[in-house]
């Protein structure tokens, strides 16, 4: 609606492609799925079951899940990708679904956490199961809890985003549009 009134719109962090926004500043979630798959492959030695924990239903997460699965199918013939475990982007839920996942699949080789809440729940669940270092953990977002998991050896890889620059770049873009005479058309 803002665009219909001539107000420029820029999205950041989570995109809304159908919004007619001028641009989006943020992570390419499909590429993030590739990076997490590659990290999971390396951490596990390319063998065993791989699990994904993240926010089911969000378009950006679904793109990451799809690319994770596609990367594994193309590059990891000795790995089985399990269905996604929904953590609802809540640390406590990530913990409970990971605990249930470990009980159901005690032979899981690697767990990949896709949202910022995933790792904070995955690591304690792996630790509590006595599987630190046995079950490999890879995750998204450079957060203090995730760094602690990496330092203690519960996690093996973190794929980082530069989230701290998304907002400033989006705001600078809007400022430039409003103060430099730059204009955009439907084709831009």
Q: Which residues make up each language-model segment?
A:
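A residue-level marker of the well-folded mature domains of exported/periplasmic proteins
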Residues: 1-188
